[in-house]
Amino acid sequence: MSSIIRINNIYTSPVIRWIIADESLWKDSNYETLLLYKKGNFQSQFNQKSIYYSESRKLKEGQFYLSLFHFEDTNLQKSATSASEGGITTNGMRSFYYQYLVDESVNGYQLVKKIEIPDITTNDCMAMPYGGNVIISIGALKEFREYNSKGEIMSKYYMNDTNFSNPIFKYTMGRYWF
């Protein structure tokens, strides 16, 4: 499991404002009261490496989006059942694009978009929204992809002559002059 931590006044007097995480990680700790309320039934983020922050004019004050890559370990969900039934668990990692709507006015967050991204087993990924689509950058595979809102791949690109790729972003280039 992972935690997303917002820190205010980071350069002067750092103060933790809130935490997004599975409740079990912070249970009975001094930080438990800083957890944002999770609206809905979904597995909190796991093993993410990067987060993309975005705003929208459609949102109210105090609301914003966090986009991230999430690795869902189905063994976490099955292990208790399998162990009690004497079953054998398989390595069940599945990867998803997650988009949270964070609402600081009510100290809560909810999962507003979840798209399964097949055949990615490395956690070296970055995800960002682009219109209704999603841009996925996979450093270890030296590729980036664009998916539509249904999770269908629209394009896939590879980079040659490099050991590793940096995160890839896509922007409209509006307001730029050439």
Regions found by a protein language model. Give the residues of each.
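Histidine-/acidic-rich catalytic cores in large beta-rich domains
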Residues: M1-F178
